[in-house]
């Protein structure tokens, strides 16, 4: 009996050790992805304080946080290659009246931008939108074979925003498709056609919370961090995990220094919780991929510094490569 009791702890220790080995092996076998960043377009001369209240311009100030009146904001798209899987996170936009009314420049079609990286738009297998606003979900139809991943909460928010009776609150769509600055602004007619075009064609997965869409590639909900159905995308890479945040973290400076950004529809507490989630997943802030950071494609945003100028003055960056993946930088 005593001998059996002595053997049992040894067996338990052996089983635990084997479990650790199997876990480490599984992690080692997890696909490592390559990732790039594409600038869909650029909002020009945006008052810095309207994007980040903590960076509001103060005339005559010598403080670096308050002496910049305007900034140019990129609209960033993530391109992720995991083995044979090609995933796009956010799509930017193509609706020319929307680009014109927002003073945007440096736009180029997403299929042409993908060609610069050596990809075909028809080969994109999955597209995840951080949320369904006009500058993030406007080119879904240009990825004909991609399955859309969108949160159910986001679709519910679209319906609510378009139908709410009080015009100061609902998403007001004015001729020729403009958007008055309401709390629900951003769900534009031509953009909603893009989103529901995928849904109606049976090319959409409606997500409820968290979901793994490919080995190691995980959607995380960030509800109300920008919109009701905001979502993040975790991606395993050779430099650690990346988290693409769309407007849940619009700004690298914001997530680094804990400042809210792009707060038009944002619950600031939920935005900070999205920041925290990226810290927990990646171990810090350097691998958090922001949607509109003015410092994108420069050394001041280190993840994006391996960059170049591409179509129509728009920029691209090679974030990280999987083992054996050749650089696509010209």
Where are each of the predicted segments found?
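Active-site metal-binding motif and surrounding structural segment of the metallo-beta-lactamase
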Residues: 104-150
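Short, electropositive alpha-helical surface patch
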Residues: 147-149, 298-324
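Solvent-exposed loop/turn segments at secondary-structure junctions
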Residues: 42-44, 93-96, 132-135, 155-157, ...
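N-terminal secretory signal peptides that target proteins for export/translocation
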Residues: 1-7
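Metallo-beta-lactamase
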Residues: 26-119, 123-126, 153-221, 239-247, 266-285, ...
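Bacterial N-terminal signal peptides
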Residues: 11-21
